[in-house]
Amino acid sequence: MMTLSSLYDSIVLKDIIMRNKITFPQSLEKILEYLIANSSTTVSGKNIAASLTDANQTVSGPTVYDYIRYIVNACIIDKVERYDIRGRKALAFEEKTYVCDLGFFQMKKNRIKDEWNFIIETLVYNELIARGYKVYIGKTYRGEIDFIAELPNSKIYIQSAYLMNDEATIEREFGAYDSVHDHYPKYVISMDPVTSDRDGIRHLNLIDFLLNENLITG
Protein backbone atom coordinates (compact mmCIF):
# COMPACT_ATOMS: atom_id res chain seq x y z
CA MET A 1 0.00 0.00 0.00
CA MET A 2 1.44 3.37 -1.03
CA THR A 3 1.78 5.90 1.79
CA LEU A 4 1.17 9.62 1.31
CA SER A 5 4.91 10.25 1.63
CA SER A 6 5.78 7.70 -1.07
CA LEU A 7 2.99 9.07 -3.29
CA TYR A 8 4.47 12.55 -2.88
CA ASP A 9 7.94 11.30 -3.78
CA SER A 10 6.58 9.43 -6.78
CA ILE A 11 4.77 12.49 -8.12
CA VAL A 12 7.78 14.77 -7.59
CA LEU A 13 10.32 12.36 -9.07
CA LYS A 14 8.32 10.87 -11.93
CA ASP A 15 5.59 13.33 -12.85
CA ILE A 16 7.58 16.52 -12.50
CA ILE A 17 11.35 16.06 -12.44
CA MET A 18 11.63 13.31 -15.03
CA ARG A 19 8.83 14.43 -17.34
CA ASN A 20 10.06 18.02 -17.49
CA LYS A 21 13.78 17.15 -17.43
CA ILE A 22 14.40 19.33 -14.38
CA THR A 23 18.09 20.10 -14.01
CA PHE A 24 17.81 21.56 -10.48
CA PRO A 25 15.54 19.13 -8.59
CA GLN A 26 16.45 20.59 -5.19
CA SER A 27 15.10 23.98 -6.28
CA LEU A 28 11.91 22.40 -7.59
CA GLU A 29 11.34 20.60 -4.30
CA LYS A 30 11.88 23.83 -2.35
CA ILE A 31 9.36 25.65 -4.55
CA LEU A 32 6.86 22.83 -4.14
CA GLU A 33 7.33 22.81 -0.36
CA TYR A 34 6.84 26.59 -0.29
CA LEU A 35 3.59 26.38 -2.28
CA ILE A 36 2.20 23.54 -0.16
CA ALA A 37 3.11 25.19 3.14
CA ASN A 38 1.58 28.47 1.98
CA SER A 39 -1.66 27.09 0.55
CA SER A 40 -4.39 29.75 0.13
CA THR A 41 -1.93 32.63 -0.12
CA THR A 42 -0.93 34.88 -3.01
CA VAL A 43 1.74 33.52 -5.35
CA SER A 44 4.76 35.73 -5.94
CA GLY A 45 7.63 34.42 -8.04
CA LYS A 46 9.76 37.19 -6.58
CA ASN A 47 9.07 36.08 -3.00
CA ILE A 48 9.73 32.44 -3.83
CA ALA A 49 13.00 33.33 -5.58
CA ALA A 50 14.00 35.39 -2.53
CA SER A 51 13.28 32.50 -0.17
CA LEU A 52 15.45 30.23 -2.32
CA THR A 53 18.24 32.79 -2.28
CA ASP A 54 18.02 32.85 1.52
CA ALA A 55 18.50 29.07 1.39
CA ASN A 56 21.57 29.51 -0.86
CA GLN A 57 19.73 28.39 -4.01
CA THR A 58 19.60 30.95 -6.81
CA VAL A 59 16.76 30.52 -9.31
CA SER A 60 15.58 33.13 -11.81
CA GLY A 61 12.01 34.46 -11.80
CA PRO A 62 11.11 32.84 -15.16
CA THR A 63 12.40 29.48 -13.92
CA VAL A 64 10.28 29.81 -10.77
CA TYR A 65 7.17 30.35 -12.89
CA ASP A 66 8.11 27.43 -15.15
CA TYR A 67 8.41 25.19 -12.10
CA ILE A 68 5.07 26.42 -10.74
CA ARG A 69 3.46 25.53 -14.08
CA TYR A 70 4.93 22.02 -13.91
CA ILE A 71 3.62 21.61 -10.35
CA VAL A 72 0.13 22.78 -11.34
CA ASN A 73 0.14 20.38 -14.31
CA ALA A 74 0.97 17.53 -11.89
CA CYS A 75 -2.25 18.33 -9.95
CA ILE A 76 -0.53 18.95 -6.62
CA ILE A 77 -1.38 22.64 -6.58
CA ASP A 78 -4.22 24.64 -8.15
CA LYS A 79 -3.65 28.23 -9.22
CA VAL A 80 -6.67 30.56 -8.96
CA GLU A 81 -7.18 33.88 -10.72
CA ARG A 82 -8.48 37.02 -9.07
CA TYR A 83 -11.66 38.54 -10.46
CA ASP A 84 -12.39 42.25 -10.27
CA ILE A 85 -16.04 42.29 -9.20
CA ARG A 86 -16.55 45.94 -10.01
CA GLY A 87 -14.75 45.80 -13.38
CA ARG A 88 -16.14 42.33 -14.16
CA LYS A 89 -12.90 40.90 -15.47
CA ALA A 90 -10.25 38.36 -14.49
CA LEU A 91 -6.91 39.80 -13.39
CA ALA A 92 -3.62 38.36 -14.61
CA PHE A 93 -1.79 38.99 -11.34
CA GLU A 94 -1.98 38.24 -7.61
CA GLU A 95 -3.12 34.66 -8.18
CA LYS A 96 -3.57 32.35 -5.20
CA THR A 97 -2.56 28.71 -4.92
CA TYR A 98 -4.29 25.86 -3.10
CA VAL A 99 -2.88 22.44 -2.32
CA CYS A 100 -5.08 19.71 -3.80
CA ASP A 101 -4.58 17.31 -0.86
CA LEU A 102 -4.37 18.65 2.70
CA GLY A 103 -2.32 15.58 3.63
CA PHE A 104 0.54 17.20 1.72
CA PHE A 105 -0.03 20.39 3.73
CA GLN A 106 0.26 18.47 6.99
CA MET A 107 3.54 16.94 5.75
CA LYS A 108 5.11 20.21 4.66
CA LYS A 109 3.53 22.93 6.79
CA ASN A 110 5.83 25.46 8.42
CA ARG A 111 3.36 27.73 10.17
CA ILE A 112 1.12 27.67 13.21
CA LYS A 113 -0.50 31.13 13.15
CA ASP A 114 -3.98 31.07 11.57
CA GLU A 115 -3.39 27.49 10.46
CA TRP A 116 -7.06 26.51 10.81
CA ASN A 117 -8.19 29.46 8.71
CA PHE A 118 -5.90 28.32 5.89
CA ILE A 119 -7.04 24.70 6.22
CA ILE A 120 -10.73 25.61 6.10
CA GLU A 121 -10.24 27.94 3.13
CA THR A 122 -8.44 25.14 1.27
CA LEU A 123 -11.16 22.62 2.19
CA VAL A 124 -13.88 24.90 0.88
CA TYR A 125 -11.96 25.57 -2.34
CA ASN A 126 -11.35 21.87 -3.03
CA GLU A 127 -15.01 21.05 -2.34
CA LEU A 128 -16.19 23.71 -4.78
CA ILE A 129 -13.88 22.31 -7.46
CA ALA A 130 -15.16 18.77 -6.75
CA ARG A 131 -18.72 20.04 -7.30
CA GLY A 132 -17.80 21.41 -10.70
CA TYR A 133 -17.57 25.12 -9.96
CA LYS A 134 -15.22 27.50 -11.74
CA VAL A 135 -13.63 29.39 -8.86
CA TYR A 136 -12.09 32.85 -8.65
CA ILE A 137 -10.77 35.04 -5.85
CA GLY A 138 -12.98 38.13 -5.63
CA LYS A 139 -11.39 41.58 -5.62
CA THR A 140 -13.36 44.58 -4.38
CA TYR A 141 -12.30 48.16 -3.80
CA ARG A 142 -12.30 47.37 -0.06
CA GLY A 143 -10.41 44.11 -0.17
CA GLU A 144 -11.13 40.50 -1.03
CA ILE A 145 -13.91 37.92 -1.20
CA ASP A 146 -12.51 34.44 -0.61
CA PHE A 147 -14.38 32.80 -3.49
CA ILE A 148 -16.59 33.56 -6.45
CA ALA A 149 -17.92 30.18 -7.58
CA GLU A 150 -19.67 29.84 -10.93
CA LEU A 151 -21.66 27.18 -12.74
CA PRO A 152 -23.01 27.74 -16.27
CA ASN A 153 -26.23 29.30 -14.98
CA SER A 154 -25.42 30.41 -11.45
CA LYS A 155 -22.94 32.25 -9.25
CA ILE A 156 -22.31 32.40 -5.50
CA TYR A 157 -19.93 34.20 -3.16
CA ILE A 158 -18.25 32.52 -0.18
CA GLN A 159 -16.25 33.75 2.79
CA SER A 160 -14.55 31.17 5.03
CA ALA A 161 -13.23 31.36 8.58
CA TYR A 162 -12.35 29.07 11.48
CA LEU A 163 -14.62 30.47 14.20
CA MET A 164 -16.74 33.62 14.39
CA ASN A 165 -15.81 34.09 18.02
CA ASP A 166 -15.30 37.84 18.23
CA GLU A 167 -16.86 40.97 16.80
CA ALA A 168 -13.82 41.79 14.65
CA THR A 169 -14.00 38.42 12.87
CA ILE A 170 -17.76 38.69 12.39
CA GLU A 171 -17.41 42.16 10.92
CA ARG A 172 -14.51 41.10 8.67
CA GLU A 173 -16.33 38.11 7.20
CA PHE A 174 -19.81 39.59 6.79
CA GLY A 175 -18.49 43.09 6.10
CA ALA A 176 -16.48 41.83 3.12
CA TYR A 177 -19.78 41.85 1.22
CA ASP A 178 -20.53 45.52 1.88
CA SER A 179 -18.96 46.48 -1.45
CA VAL A 180 -20.70 43.73 -3.45
CA HIS A 181 -23.95 45.19 -4.74
CA ASP A 182 -25.43 42.42 -6.87
CA HIS A 183 -28.06 39.90 -5.77
CA TYR A 184 -26.19 36.62 -6.11
CA PRO A 185 -26.26 34.38 -2.98
CA LYS A 186 -23.61 35.14 -0.37
CA TYR A 187 -22.32 32.77 2.30
CA VAL A 188 -19.98 32.65 5.29
CA ILE A 189 -18.70 29.16 6.15
CA SER A 190 -17.06 28.41 9.51
CA MET A 191 -16.67 25.69 12.15
CA ASP A 192 -19.18 27.32 14.51
CA PRO A 193 -21.73 24.71 15.68
CA VAL A 194 -24.43 27.39 15.88
CA THR A 195 -24.73 29.72 12.91
CA SER A 196 -26.43 33.08 12.52
CA ASP A 197 -27.37 34.73 9.21
CA ARG A 198 -26.99 38.49 8.77
CA ASP A 199 -28.43 40.95 6.24
CA GLY A 200 -29.40 38.17 3.83
CA ILE A 201 -25.96 36.53 4.05
CA ARG A 202 -26.21 32.88 5.07
CA HIS A 203 -23.87 31.50 7.72
CA LEU A 204 -23.16 27.77 7.29
CA ASN A 205 -21.33 25.22 9.40
CA LEU A 206 -18.39 23.69 7.50
CA ILE A 207 -19.39 20.07 8.15
CA ASP A 208 -22.96 20.73 7.01
CA PHE A 209 -21.59 22.38 3.86
CA LEU A 210 -19.35 19.39 3.10
CA LEU A 211 -22.12 16.84 3.67
CA ASN A 212 -25.01 18.59 1.91
CA GLU A 213 -24.55 19.97 -1.60
CA ASN A 214 -28.03 21.50 -1.49
CA LEU A 215 -27.09 24.04 1.20
CA ILE A 216 -25.59 26.37 -1.40
CA THR A 217 -27.54 27.35 -4.46
CA GLY A 218 -27.10 29.94 -7.17
Each model region followed by its residue ranges:
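Short, solvent-exposed polar/charged micro-motifs at secondary-structure junctions
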Residues: 89-90, 145-148, 196-199, 213-215
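Short conserved micro-motifs at the rims of enzyme active sites and ligand-binding pockets
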Residues: 109-111, 169-170, 199, 215-216
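Generic recognition of well-ordered alpha-helical segments
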Residues: 107, 176, 209-212
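Accessory nucleic acid-recognition modules appended to NTPase machines
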Residues: 2-155
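Conserved beta3 VAIK motif of the Hanks protein kinase fold
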Residues: 158
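Short, histidine-centered active-site or binding-site loop motifs used for metal coordination
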Residues: 103, 161-162
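Catalytic cores of nucleic-acid endonucleases
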Residues: 138, 162-207
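Non-catalytic C-terminal interaction segments of nucleic acid-processing enzymes
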Residues: 206-218
